[in-house]
């Protein structure tokens, strides 16, 4: 469907299960943000790609040099950014894997327990998201070292400098 030279990342949804493999949520995407990203402007601010259900082609793999100057927040997120900046990010709305949620997971599916903790201590949530914004901006700066289109460059520059606006 797509020429080989087009960088592609294809990903799917996951079912969230507990430690005993009981289904907790039929869709991880719907527990996270209720949408799956396919565009750069979405992916800059939020990653919806989980590496275990992602497939990439050689054209996308070749874009990742391993010589990035800025820290990568998450490898699957960076690959999704590359796909949206240079090719296609494709979502298939079908769970293809069980995501086992442990009670001590740091990342992963959002649970009621995590949400209650955030309501009780909003300052911790604020600090966490502030750090996430700064880290995602740092990660996105790597794209500016690559030959992106002028339109894509403008989107990325606006994103990485948005906190600098007085």
Predicted regions and their residues:
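Secondary-structure boundary motif
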Residues: 2-4, 66, 85, 145
